[in-house]
Amino acid sequence: SDDDFALVDALMRANEEMRVIAVGDDDQNIYEFRGSNSHYMEELGRMQGSRFIEMTENYRSSEHVVDAVNDFAPNISYRLKTAPIISMKKEKGMVSIIKHPPFFQDKESGEKKAVYMFLPIVNDILQNNRQGKTCILTQTNEEAVITVALLHENGLNAKLIQSMDGLRFWNIAEVRYFVKCIDRMQKTTRAPIITEDIWEEAKSKTLQKYSTSNSLPYLKRCIMMFELMNKAKYYTDLRDFLFESSVEDFCDVSDADIVVSTIHKAKGREFDNVIMLVVEPEHYTDDIMRRLYVGMSRTKLSLTIHTNGKIFDDIRADKRISDPIHYPMPDEIELQLSHKDVNLGAFKEHKKTILSLRSGDTLAYHDYHLSLPSTGTDIGLLSMNMQKKMLQWQMKGYLVTRATVRFVVAWRPKEAA
């Protein structure tokens, strides 16, 4: 970002002997929305005495996958790299492209209707016994949630890498309670280090209070990671660790046969097999091209791309299949709401009731309201933006049949002191 580069530049000016090593893959820069830009690396490379070194050896992906990635890379118009990547693996691997029609003509109305690729991807999983861990990569959160729900419907062991839309891990009820337990006991000692007795008691109380919560595994994994990294448990270190962490950091997918994720959430991860769902955009941009490049390069052995576009027509592939079937949307879909999809102010009068809820608890739904099934009391309301989205789904023929609590979180309005 501008600030990061300005800091590095200032440090270099103040320390003439300082050596700066900037490492990165410009083709995988998919965080421009955060201010990240490869131009900063290019600017460093232009400075006097600098050297630009391309590291071309790839130890993750099989030969045919790397060939496909190399063929795709020139679609990115602004690139620093020029040399092709070389696979250092013995496996040849497999690249498959399944082409779907962009739309179909309704025989009765004559309207052009979209072709959806959720069903063929699930059929692909069911029909092809891939060895190792498989990941389905989508471009949007909505695509990911619909896909994982369809996998579950077909009895497949799938997990979603959660997307929290900016929700802080620190604000989750289970985390707040754990810290509160430590705070209460630490007041008596006022020591900078959390004693083993206090630590274990706080863990025990939290695990007992939230034993039925679907969110508890995130905190348990967080605690385990903190224990592994810190022999001495400093209170300030714990608070910093919790405050700087995100829910995604503690999403354990090790026991899942199939992982579903957006490309952004899969950055930095790798899988034996990758299946990509790529809907043709109105316009291709470098940002989209880099995102697809990242998705393709997540796999170690096989890459399968389901697409209704032409962008993969010229890359090397072991198998090309044309699937002309007009797949509809699934009969049942799942929407995953974040804190931005509810009217937070509507919860203010029901704090005690909401704190008694646990992740996974069932809620009733009517007219954009969320209520307790036992009493019918309304305790929540969808945001105006989410109400519009729900109306669009209703116009497509979908009706809400059930709702569950995803997370219970702490929240304070901006105007609060």
Please give the residue ranges for each predicted region.
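Flexible, surface-exposed loop/gating regions in the mature catalytic domains
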Residues: 52-54, 77, 81-85, 124, ...
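Extended, charge-rich low-complexity interaction segments
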Residues: 86-94, 98, 123-129, 185-216, ...
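Amphipathic coiled-coil/heptad-repeat helices and related helical stalk/stem segments
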Residues: 4, 37, 114, 118, ...
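Conserved active-site motif detector
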Residues: 313, 317-417
